[in-house]
């Protein structure tokens, strides 16, 4: 089926390929990716954009000793194909299948695991310094996108390696930023001579000789100032040069000859160097080229039409976005903040209708939280929409800048609970634990999509920090639950009365608990169902009443058990000297792999059958 790909066996096979063969290979890889991802889902556009870049890196470097770190990691599919994992792509992102991100236990060619952005340069600097301490000899390459480069961690790492002159090669995969008009022929010429070792040696020798005399030193400094002024006008990489990192580029990221040539020369430069590569997301697939956001991370789709196979449904993200627009229409103090996740968090419509009150700060969660605190301190009602897994990056800002001052920031925590196919780095199963430990923080969760609107409207009217957590997708199992429309701080909703057993469920697990209740009635077990709308503070009055009536408690949450709501309930019952039995159902103290959500629930006994079995044994 594929002339080159079918016969490719080892990372060294690429070394002797001609430019024409590499171009044909690139075409085959694109066809392979489109075919496979259309059947499994995955990150398509970003991988189509780095085919030539990845081939060039593999051709120039010796992957049996050199280390490539892929920032974020979702653009590493081509790397996986070239490192012996082509035959596993039918299982991409499936349970026990090929991960969508680099995994050290998956291949010796995955030097470092990634998933969150802006980490690659820091990791590369650590690996490079370990190499130098051990007196080893290999290259360390960090591949980072223009979006990830906006992250504070990436800038911190650049500052460090530029100052310390750490020998690291950085590939800036730029698929979005525009290049100013003055970056043209002059820039190309300057890059050409800066790549020439004779030029670099001559420049160093001239400066050394000039500095031997007082007059020469002044001349040398003047030349440096003049040269710096010219470069400032014509070279977009001046920022990198100023902090001590050699800048090369920009170059065409789809021109294999130019890529291999410049990468080879970058390899010879001592000290940190950044190569600016211009690529196109979705390259080679017209639908992805026209709509790269849609194909950034997509489910199964028809490769001939580009249309998704599953029909879109009402989701929590859409409900949140709709609620934000409605609230903003009635309250000009409401502002929305996102960290480069406008589409994912459902804020597209808000950004268009209220551009002055919409802030996309880039991949800067720490900055986003403290900026929200500043807005709240001056009378505005900031809502920070963020994935659960990414809010982890701003824990100190939540604690130090928001909660100590008890500022009314609303955290709209999307993708809470397990998210499935993206695996360990993206499962949102820690937010209850890390937020419940912070004084002045209130945590809420809607039991259904429809309830989120009412919670958001209530939350923005309060004068203290509130986190509202909700899952990926839409209603879990049942869509017949009526949303709670009025809330009292720290009070739960009793959905069903019962005997002997009280199930306290959080968020989407409430719908699951309702189905479990119906199943358990067949075994003569009549459970009360409590919707823990407030995770913190817990409803102590309701707990006390059920405890005094000698109920056993079953707590179901989509969070790790350590520090979850079950822990809060146990702590309260212990403080009150109650002896009621408590069964906590949640996730173990381990990182949760990738796979279909229902398969993962079954793995942890959080599917309907598993929950029923645990309660029957407990009863």
Curated annotation (Swiss-Prot):
| Gene Ontology biological process terms, A to Z | 1-deoxy-D-xylulose 5-phosphate biosynthetic process; isopentenyl diphosphate biosynthetic process, methylerythritol 4-phosphate pathway; terpenoid biosynthetic process; thiamine biosynthetic process
Q: Which cofactor does it need?
A: Mg(2+); thiamine diphosphate
Q: Which residues bind thiamine diphosphate?
A: 74, 115-117, 147-148, 175, 285, 365
**Gene3D superfamilies hit by this protein:** 3.40.50.920, 3.40.50.970
According to its UniProt record, in which pathway does this protein act?
Metabolic intermediate biosynthesis; 1-deoxy-D-xylulose 5-phosphate biosynthesis; 1-deoxy-D-xylulose 5-phosphate from D-glyceraldehyde 3-phosphate and pyruvate: step 1/1
Q: Where is the signal peptide?
A: none
E.C. numbers: 2.2.1.7
Cysteines engaged in disulfide bonds, as pairs: none
Q: How does it assemble?
A: Homodimer.
Instruction: Report the protein name in the record.
Output: 1-deoxy-D-xylulose-5-phosphate synthase
Q: Which organism is it from?
A: Clostridium acetobutylicum (strain ATCC 824 / DSM 792 / JCM 1419 / IAM 19013 / LMG 5710 / NBRC 13948 / NRRL B-527 / VKM B-1787 / 2291 / W)
Q: Which gene encodes it?
A: dxs
